[in-house]
């Protein structure tokens, strides 16, 4: 099942995000990520994340989100994990 992990950074946390980024990217290579990328502020700086993951259920998806180095470093003001259905341009349905 697919889940959207929607994260909002704490204010003034760009330095923490950039310092933690290498570990975050390495971690994402270890889980079943279908797509990911940052949200951007008006200046083009990252201020949140969207990660689409595959997991067996909500509990597993939340555990995956909680083990992300960004989450463990305290970067996020909020983390929302929601079931997601990929309808448009899903490469697995072609």
Task: Name each region found by the language model.
Residues 1-94:
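Conserved, structured core segments of small domains
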